[in-house]
Amino acid sequence: MEDQKQTPSNQTATPAGDEATSTAAASPETGAPDTAAAAVDDVAAQLAALEAKASEHYDLYMRAVAEGENIRRRAQEDVAKAHKFAIENFADNLLPVMDSLQAALADGSGDIAKLREGVELTARQLAAAFERGKIVELNPVGEKFDPHRHQAISMVPADQEPNTVVTVLQRGYTIADRVLRPALVTVAAPK
């Protein structure tokens, strides 16, 4: 009993010889440093591979971010160009109208029939330009009054149903279902 150390009651006493055996088992043997070095080298190689993979993914991420910025910038430039040159096509369609008006002003013959024919031709050119520009004329005679599309100037006694358009004083126009100018109209008064 003298060989045993005093231990608390929940632990068992270990002989002195057994401690030496367990310490020897825990200490590395002569081949153990090579194994530990190999494990460290293996972990270092794995770490290097993972760092390379992370660097590659970061590079791909940065390229994707740059590409997204380029796409956004190009889209903004395209929108700016569209706004800047949207009227160009319509203006190109109006040039023949201007040419016809200038030719009419330059004509000094005084022939009213010829002048009327030129004005009618110019009006057809303008109507064609409006059609290509998707501008539609409003002719609301007989329609119910719509304050979004019509502007009532007065109410007049008429045989028509109350609140319907009787006459158009100035034509209105829409472009792609959006009112450019409401039609100036007179409306049938209630009876």
UniProtKB/Swiss-Prot annotation:
Instruction: State the GO CC annotations.
Output: cytosol
Does the UniProt entry include the keyword Cell wall biogenesis/degradation? no
What is a single Pfam family found in this protein's UniProt entry? Answer: GrpE
- Self-association and partners: Homodimer.
Enumerate the subcellular locations listed in this protein's record, separating them with semicolons. Cytoplasm
Species this protein is from: Cupriavidus taiwanensis (strain DSM 17343 / BCRC 17206 / CCUG 44338 / CIP 107171 / LMG 19424 / R1) (Ralstonia taiwanensis (strain LMG 19424))
Q: Which NCBIfam families match?
A: PRK14139.1, PRK14140.1, PRK14150.1
Q: Does the keyword Protein transport apply?
A: no
Job description of the protein: Participates actively in the response to hyperosmotic and heat shock by preventing the aggregation of stress-denatured proteins, in association with DnaK and GrpE. It is the nucleotide exchange factor for DnaK and may function as a thermosensor. Unfolded proteins bind initially to DnaJ; upon interaction with the DnaJ-bound protein, DnaK hydrolyzes its bound ATP, resulting in the formation of a stable complex. GrpE releases ADP from DnaK; ATP binding to DnaK triggers the release of the substrate protein, thus completing the reaction cycle.
> Which HAMAP family does its entry note?
GrpE
Q: What is this protein called?
A: Protein GrpE
Question: Where do the record's region annotations for Disordered lie?
Answer: 1-35
Q: Where would you say this protein principally sits, based on its record?
A: cytoplasm
Q: Which UniProt keywords apply?
A: Chaperone, Cytoplasm, Stress response
Give the compositionally biased regions (Polar residues).
1-14
Ranges of Low complexity composition bias in the record? 19-35
Q: Which InterPro entries does the annotation name? A: GrpE, GrpE_coiled_coil, GrpE_head
Q: Which GO BP terms apply? A: protein folding
Family the entry assigns: Belongs to the GrpE family.
Q: Provide the GO MF annotations for this entry.
A: adenyl-nucleotide exchange factor activity; protein homodimerization activity; protein-folding chaperone binding; unfolded protein binding
Taxonomic lineage: Bacteria, Pseudomonadati, Pseudomonadota, Betaproteobacteria, Burkholderiales
